[in-house]
């Protein structure tokens, strides 16, 4: 992928605007809650619930953009706007990307 895992400037801008301590809390909240969004992607895919799937993908996309996790945001955008159902491999890929993004965000937050 051409995009960086985390756009440093976006993350730094967020820290400058909201404060480093608050961003650290946001990152931890995201790390705790985002896996549930991936679980929602999986369950809505297996249940054929297209709207729930799109909503979970949209949330991942929005959070990704907020933190500068551009690859995560792009993968989520593709899931959100793409046809439904999607191949389960796409959900597996976003789950793996989420793990990478969370690790990188935690490292940046703790600077």
Question: Which residue ranges define each predicted feature?
Answer:
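Short helix-adjacent coil turns
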Residues: 18, 41, 45-52, 67-68, ...
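Short, charged, low-complexity loops and linkers
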Residues: 11-24, 55
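Amphipathic, coiled-coil-like alpha-helical segments
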Residues: 1-9, 24-26, 31-32, 37, ...
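Short hydrophobic/aromatic-rich motifs at helix boundaries and adjacent loops
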Residues: 9-14, 47-49
């Amino acid at each position: 992928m051409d995009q960086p895992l985390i756009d440093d400037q976006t993350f730094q801008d967020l820290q400058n605007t909201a404060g480093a301590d608050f961003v650290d809390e946001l990152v931890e909240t995201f790390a705790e809650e985002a896996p549930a969004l991936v679980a929602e992607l999986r369950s809505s895919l297996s249940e054929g619930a297209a709207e729930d799937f799109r909503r979970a993908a949209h949330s991942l996309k929005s959070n990704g953009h907020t933190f500068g996790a551009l690859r995560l945001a792009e993968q989520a955008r593709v899931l959100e706007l793409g046809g439904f159902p999607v191949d389960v491999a796409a959900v597996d890929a976003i789950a793996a990307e989420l793990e990478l993004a969370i690790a990188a965000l935690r490292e940046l937050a703790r600077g």
